[in-house]
Amino acid sequence: MENKMKVQITTSNQEHIAGYREISIKDGKIDFQEISDNECTHILANNILDVFPAQQVKLCIMELVKKLRLGGTLVVGGTDLRIFSLNVINGMLQPNEASDIISSVSSMSDTGTIANFIREMNLTIINTQIGGVHYEISAERK
């Protein structure tokens, strides 16, 4: 029987999903001490990219990919800067809503840039979803 390790990377205000091994972000780093490289069949990191400064987002994705086994899937997500900006300019986000979002993130990136980072690491994009200003990208390591 194949060992299926499903991991969820969580922030301090995020609920744990049953059936996933929870890995927390501590001191600005993902605590992967107990996870070997190429061990995970599925990594759910759909709300974490905003936690890292812009200069560390690519490194974060690289760390996630190292833990993913061949055939494994990765889901990453964050706040899309371009969509956020358009929503502010077009009045779809009120100033207080925009301010709340800005104060809750360390950085914002755009979906295209993150998809390119993922492709650079030889993963295949399976799906991209956008809801409001949040995006999620699913990819597979082949």
Residue ranges and their predicted role:
Residues 1-35, 73-142:
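Class I (Rossmann-like) S-adenosyl-L-methionine-dependent methyltransferase catalytic domain
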Residues 39-44:
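Hydrophobic beta-strand segment of the Class I
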Residues 48-51:
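Hydrophobic adenine-recognition pocket in adenosine-nucleotide-binding enzymes
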Residues 53-55:
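Acidic-and-aromatic substrate-binding clefts and catalytic sites of carbohydrate-active enzymes
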Residues 58-73:
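A short glycine-rich, Lys/Arg-flanked "PGG" loop and its adjoining helix->strand segment in the class I
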